Amino acid sequence: MADVDKLNIDSIIQRLLEVRGSKPGKNVQLQENEIRGLCLKSREIFLSQPILLELEAPLKICGDIHGQYYDLLRLFEYGGFPPESNYLFLGDYVDRGKQSLETICLLLAYKIKYPENFFLLRGNHECASINRIYGFYDECKRRYNIKLWKTFTDCFNCLPIAAIVDEKIFCCHGGLSPDLQSMEQIRRIMRPTDVPDQGLLCDLLWSDPDKDVLGWGENDRGVSFTFGAEVVAKFLHKHDLDLICRAHQVVEDGYEFFAKRQLVTLFSAPNYCGEFDNAGAMMSVDETLMCSFQILKPAEKKKPNASRPVTPPRGIITKQAKK
């Protein structure tokens, strides 16, 4: 299509990055046909790559961004702008924050520019029924039009669902599913697809770990399930994996371990929605699969007795970098 053929990706990235150093909140108003081109071209790339990505370290893994564009720029300043580092994002790019459009446009532009070094998974907010309600639809309608929001929906319906890093680290947005017995089940999911109300795809995007649950439990979200530590241990053992890396929940320090450090939650939007005093974090995985955490501190000072950093896991050594 014409929008794709004449897409000047370098110019788009340059304009999106021009606001670095500006006061947070300054918008970048791309042309509508440029955004449409980003959606169409990235959709093509998503469909040309597997729904279950098989990735190699080294790479940096990021959790929810939720339209906090200036925090996304901070993450890149800290971790290195592509292609300096390889990246995997775990979903939830849009909704709640003020600049979902800039956020998703920069991420899609990097996907197009560096398709083998930059990866985006689907979060539960990359779904029309959710982002219709929580801000993205309204932002598209206010700044462009509803048709453009529908173009994003077509793109989101083609995002990959999960990734495995060096056959050892399983990554998805939400968590495990009682229906997940074999990785082949993920590979068999056909795209484009909406997110169903239940089942494997729904669970991978919506489920949560819960230390108080044995096996599977009801989820307070009213969608999917919660799962306990034993479910994690059994899953890792069965599939010869070391770690589950997921996002989907705000955690105070930007990262939080679960199940004897066999699962880690990453959340990359500091001061989430301006309502939380959380840090944001990014996990760096080196060639030896050593994991370390880079922290974006929240703007306000933390309370003096904030919890201590979590003890490093066995087998996967961690160190903490603060900024």
Curated annotation (Swiss-Prot):
Region feature (Disordered): 301-323
Subcellular localization, as worded in the UniProt entry: Cytoplasm; Nucleus; Cleavage furrow; Nucleus, Nucleolus
Cofactor detail note: Binds 2 manganese ions per subunit.
Keyword Nucleus: yes
SUPFAM superfamilies, per the entry: Metallo-dependent phosphatases (SSF56300)
Record keyword rRNA processing present: no
Residues where Mn(2+) 1 binds: D64, H66, D92
Reaction catalysis annotation: O-phospho-L-seryl-[protein] + H2O = L-seryl-[protein] + phosphate; O-phospho-L-threonyl-[protein] + H2O = L-threonyl-[protein] + phosphate
The EC number(s) this enzyme carries: 3.1.3.16
Pfam families: Metallophos, STPPase_N
Any Gene Ontology CC annotation: nucleus
Cofactor list: Mn(2+)
The organism's place on the tree of life at top rank: Eukaryota
GO biological process, alphabetically ordered: cell division; glycogen metabolic process; mitotic nuclear membrane reassembly; protein dephosphorylation
Binding site for Mn(2+) 2: D92, N124, H173, H248
Active site, per annotation: H125 (proton donor)
Function of the protein: Protein phosphatase that associates with over 200 regulatory proteins to form highly specific holoenzymes which dephosphorylate hundreds of biological targets. Protein phosphatase 1 (PP1) is essential for cell division, and participates in the regulation of glycogen metabolism, muscle contractility and protein synthesis. Promotes nuclear envelope reassembly by targeting nuclear membrane vesicles to chromatin at the end of mitosis. Acts by dephosphorylating membrane proteins such as lamin B receptor (lbr) to regulate the binding of membrane proteins to chromatin.
Protein family (similarity comment): Belongs to the PPP phosphatase family. PP-1 subfamily.
Subunit structure: PP1 comprises a catalytic subunit, ppp1c1, ppp1cb or ppp1cc, which is folded into its native form by inhibitor 2 and glycogen synthetase kinase 3, and then is complexed to one or several targeting or regulatory subunits.
PANTHER family on file: SERINE/THREONINE PROTEIN PHOSPHATASE, SERINE_THREONINE-PROTEIN PHOSPHATASE
Identification of the protein by name: Serine/threonine-protein phosphatase PP1-gamma catalytic subunit B
Organism: Xenopus laevis
